[in-house]
C-alpha cells in the first residue's frame, strides 16, 4: 500500500470515530417540526419553540410561564404516557397529512397513532397560543422552580 493511501485510510477512520461521538437526533422530532409548520402555516420557524419557557425544548420543570409553555408541558406529559404504554415517542415515525392547514394522523392504531396524536395536538396548540418573545431563552434556573 502506498503512503498516500494510508493517509486517506487514516483520515477516513478518524472522521468515522468523530462521527460516532455525535448523538443521533430523534427521527420523530423532524416529523414533529413538519406538523408544527402545517398547523401554524409556516408563520413561525420551528426553532422558535426549542428554547421557550420552562417546557419547550429539552426537559422541563416548574410552572409553565404561559399558554404556549403549557402546550409544551402537555406534549411532554403525552410522551411520558406513551412511554408507559411501551412506545418510544422520539423514535416513532407515523403517517400523517396536512389537510385544511391542520395536521391529521393517518396511522390508525398503536404507538404510531398515540405519538401522532401527541404531536398533532401540540402543533395545533402551538398555532393557537400567543408567542411572547420575552419567554424565549429564559433563565430556567430562576423562572422554572
UniProtKB/Swiss-Prot annotation:
| InterPro entries named among the record's database cross-references | PLipase_A2 (IPR001211), PLipase_A2_Asp_AS (IPR033112), PLipase_A2_dom (IPR016090), PLipase_A2_dom_sf (IPR036444), PLipase_A2_His_AS (IPR033113)
Which Cys residues form disulphide pairs?
38-98, 54-144, 56-72, 71-125, 78-118, 87-111, 105-116
- A Pfam match: Phospholip_A2_1
Write out the catalysed reaction: a 1,2-diacyl-sn-glycero-3-phosphocholine + H2O = a 1-acyl-sn-glycero-3-phosphocholine + a fatty acid + H(+)
Class of enzymatic activity (EC top level): hydrolase
Q: How is the cofactor bound, as the UniProt entry phrases it?
A: Binds 1 Ca(2+) ion.
Compartmental location: Secreted
Q: Which sites are catalytic?
A: 75, 119
Q: What is its EC number?
A: 3.1.1.4
Chief localisation class:
secreted
State the source organism's domain of life.
Eukaryota
Protein name stated in the entry: Basic phospholipase A2 S10-58F
Amino acid at each position: 500500500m502506498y503512503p498516500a493511501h494510508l493517509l486517506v485510510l487514516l483520515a477516513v477512520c478518524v472522521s468515522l470515530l468523530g462521527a460516532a461521538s455525535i448523538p443521533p437526533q430523534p427521527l420523530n422530532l423532524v416529523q414533529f417540526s413538519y406538523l408544527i409548520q402545517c398547523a401554524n402555516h409556516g408563520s413561525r420557524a420551528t426553532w422558535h419553540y426549542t428554547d421557550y419557557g420552562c417546557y419547550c425544548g429539552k426537559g422541563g420543570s416548574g410552572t409553565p410561564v404561559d399558554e404556549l409553555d403549557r402546550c409544551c408541558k402537555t406534549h411532554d406529559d403525552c410522551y411520558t404516557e406513551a412511554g408507559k404504554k411501551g412506545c418510544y415517542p422520539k423514535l416513532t415515525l407515523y403517517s400523517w397529512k396536512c389537510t385544511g392547514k391542520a395536521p391529521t394522523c393517518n396511522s390508525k392504531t398503536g404507538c404510531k397513532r398515540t405519538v401522532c396524536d401527541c404531536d398533532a395536538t401540540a402543533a395545533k396548540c402551538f398555532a393557537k397560543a400567543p408567542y411572547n418573545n420575552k419567554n424565549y431563552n429564559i433563565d430556567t434556573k430562576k423562572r422554572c422552580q
